[in-house]
Amino acid sequence: MGPIIMSGYIADHNSWRGGYLAVSLIQFSLVLILLVTLPLWKRVAASRELERRQNGEYVEYTEPEERSKVNVLGIKGVKPTLIAFLLYCGVESTVGLWGASYLVGVRQITAETAAGWISLYYGGITAGRLITGFITLKVHNRILIRCGQFITIAGAGILLLPLPDAFSLIGFILIGLGLAPIYPGLIHETPTRFGKENSAKLIGYQMAVAYTGSTFLPPLMGVIATKTSMILFPFLVLFFLVAMLLSAEKVNIVLGKRKQAGN
């Protein structure tokens, strides 16, 4: 949303100061809303934890005195979760960094239009996060993550098809909307899936792997484009998205087997 607001102020008023002020006011408003609604978040978290315990979804792996001895990477389901984090951040960065180059070089769209469309891709992520923030009160994170992944794959599929240029914009927006619930959903599910006592250490690993994806996958796209052509951009994005879906579903399968074994 920030790039869209800033570009609008620069285009209409030839000044960045108004855009800077508008973004600052939005950020302060969000902070105020979060502070006011903190009690609500705590009540929702407590009720959700109670519901998961009653449904047998909450699993504790160790007693408190054994926490330091646990190898979190050895817990079943952790490794495919880390792969999903790596691919998520890699895809988000790759689309943001190379999407405009694909639009200009392959779709023959002007640089100004391409930049605006990529801003709308980020706008899709922002809008998706706002929407899922409310939906998550009623819908399980696992469902949101899965739906988001299917939406991203649909968006990448649109980029692959020989459709009019306007459909490329739809594809980028769908990818942004689909990506929105995945990252926060995976983070939020960590204590439930792998135990509260393991979550702090495991989230640290998840952050490290996520930044690794942001660091290395976009340059990989650049190397591939240099050696071949930017026409491969949607194919590579689709490959990453499908691999992320398979990794996330692998975790669900492992958790399902564990729940059945517990019963």
Annotate the PLM regions.
Residues A45-T81:
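Juxtamembrane intracellular "pre-TM" segments in multi-pass secondary transporters
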Residues G74-S119, G123-T126:
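Extracytoplasmic gate region of multi-pass secondary transporters
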Residues M1-R43:
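Helix-loop-helix hairpin linking two adjacent transmembrane segments in secondary transporters
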Residues I4-N14, L103-V104, I135-T136, M221-S229:
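Interfacial helix-cap and linker-helix signal at transmembrane-aqueous boundaries
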Residues R193-M230:
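A late C-terminal transmembrane helix in Major Facilitator Superfamily
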Residues I143-I158:
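Structural signature of the two symmetry-related core transmembrane helices
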Residues G155, A166-L174:
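Paired small-residue
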Residues P181-F194:
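Intracellular juxtamembrane helix-capping segments at the cytosolic ends
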